[in-house]
Amino acid sequence: MSFYRSWIGGEGELVRRYTSSIRDDAEIVEEVVKIMEAHVRHLAEVGAAPKEAAEAVAKALREVEPERLLTSEFEDVHEALEKWLVDRLGEEVAGWIGLGRSRNDHVAAAIRLAALRKTGVLKKAVERMRCVLAKRALEYADCAMPSFTHFQPAQAITFGHYLLAVDELAGEFLHVLKPVEELLKRSPLGAGPAGGARAPIDRERVAKLAGFEGVVENALYASGSRFFALALASAVVSFLVELSRAVDDFIRWNSPLVGYVAAPDSHVSTSSIMPHKRNLVTLEVFRARAAEALGHLAALHAVVMKIGMGYSLDLQEATRHLWAVLNIASEGVEVFTDFLEKMSFDCGRARRDAERYYSTSSDTAEEAALRGVPFRRAYFQLAREIREGAARLLPVDEALRRPTRGSANPEEVKRAASARLVFCREKPL
């Protein structure tokens, strides 16, 4: 029988298994231990608990093996940790740890710290991807290809320009993460179950001891809100949704019907009956898991939206969706980066398509307008010539020499990629 509800009785194994979060708590067990140590040290600081008891608990916490806490007989890791401490130190010593705390504020704190840790892992993966993108963009700065709009050949660009578009997406994602990280760095400790603690907890001090940089002011909001989780998961899933568009391009370009991309052998599989097949399975899985992450985001919102402002056990069920989103993102970015490092691009074939499918038509019409012909007149004249097979278009290399910042001009691509690589060299990952 679980520790906290032992005085109630009536618990069966079926119910315990059904309501326990112990398996999911593997994601936060280290943070739970860290927060407990900060809590007991602070109790001693303010004279709310005997110093000797706090020191004994802190020493035991430094010796605990987290995996030993993850046993199915408990409701959650908080209960498992307290029972472990009581068994090890006795109630006269370990019995003080419940003062001034609730599972509500402590689990919110643990989730914030674990989310901050996992966000750091994801950020490093994205930064490394950006460096690979910049390196390959510089390599392919002059590699002409058609862009695609409506899945039709469109304006001529270079593959380097395309890769820098993915890099800019990654940069914007990291920018969006900054204010979300500020939310994660605020501590709910001392908020108690909903209205604060009777013990003289200095919330700023215990926040600092636990590794936070500020506090969530209102105790009800601090213990019961999961806005920080919604914000983080939303940002990550938005990034995955956008990144999966690029992944989809690479899957299409890997088809021999297009033939732009040669995928590395380590990223392809074959058919059990058609031995000629080279299926880009890693990116197919990425695409599917990005969709799965979107489902986790919807589930997270659905769980949170109708439970009132205070804590309910529904929130326990919400947290696993946050971990799923973060884990899917970190693993997917790592795999995609490996693909980007090892793939090759057929510049000759891409250039031939850019020439074949009128990808310099807009530049040709603009060039005529810049020489004094009203643009729409030049546009319709060129349209007639294309229809009649008599169009004389600007050569691809000349069309690419567009003067605008951020264009597909190879010199602009080299400038942007080189600037990013300077950052990569200054901050090696």
UniProtKB/Swiss-Prot annotation:
Superkingdom per UniProt: Archaea
EC number: 4.3.2.1
Top enzyme category: lyase
Reaction equation(s) it catalyzes: 2-(N(omega)-L-arginino)succinate = fumarate + L-arginine
UniProt pathway: Amino-acid biosynthesis; L-arginine biosynthesis; L-arginine from L-ornithine and carbamoyl phosphate: step 3/3
InterPro entries registered for this protein in UniProt: Argininosuccinate_lyase, Fumarase/histidase_N, Fumarate_lyase_fam, Fumarate_lyase_N, L-Aspartase-like
Keyword terms of this UniProt record: Amino-acid biosynthesis, Arginine biosynthesis, Cytoplasm, Lyase
GO cellular component: cytosol
KW Amino-acid biosynthesis (keyword) present: yes
GO BP terms, alphabetized: arginine biosynthetic process via ornithine; L-arginine biosynthetic process
Location(s), subcellular: Cytoplasm
UniProt GO molecular function: argininosuccinate lyase activity
Keyword ATP-binding: no
Family, per entry: Belongs to the lyase 1 family. Argininosuccinate lyase subfamily.
HAMAP family listed in its UniProt record: Arg_succ_lyase
Designated name of the protein: Argininosuccinate lyase
Source species: Pyrobaculum neutrophilum (strain DSM 2338 / JCM 9278 / NBRC 100436 / V24Sta)
Gene name for this UniProt entry: argH
